[in-house]
Amino acid sequence: MKSCCVTDVGQKRMMNQDFVYASEEPVGNLPNLFVVADGMGGHRAGDFASRYTVEIIQKSIRANRERNPIKIIRMAIETANMKVLEKANSDENLAGMGTTVVVATVVENYIYVANVGDSRLYLIRDEIQQITRDHSLVEEMVRMGEINREQARNHPDKNIITRAVGVRSRVSIDFFDMKLEKDDTVLMCSDGLSNMLEDEEIQEIIR
């Protein structure tokens, strides 16, 4: 397995509120760990939320003696949610902050994934497939048949998310797992990438 990380502020913002962590080496009882977080809540607060969330997730996993990868990741995200919310409630400069997060680990030939918000994990095999499901207003509108995918890409509310870490006392997390095959490529990203490029464009670049 080989991994690499790239993050860029882009052309629309002065500060990059994304934070990424990647370790091909063991982290606690996980054989590897990959995390992408995209903060929100103003420049300082959003940057802090994503960085702090990734930091807490790492610390929680290192201290956890559990063996089940899904349980390990769940507890780490729940701990991060509690810690971020505490910070937001105790510092007026951080009030209202939160972050998306997508977490993955590969155990033998299986990948275990968790996500909150609209940061994504893709599997690129013969075709590109979005594994995670966005927790966003436009995704709900698509599922309800109110708009189609093309309308969702250009919708004025496309950046409104319905779940985030550090916003409420309890966080709802989606989990996925699947068997990987030789030459599979896994891509984790924030909406900074998925809002700019169609899935097929991403696939062409990765290839």
How would you name each of these model-derived features?
Residues 1-207:
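PP2C/PPM-type serine/threonine phosphatase catalytic domain
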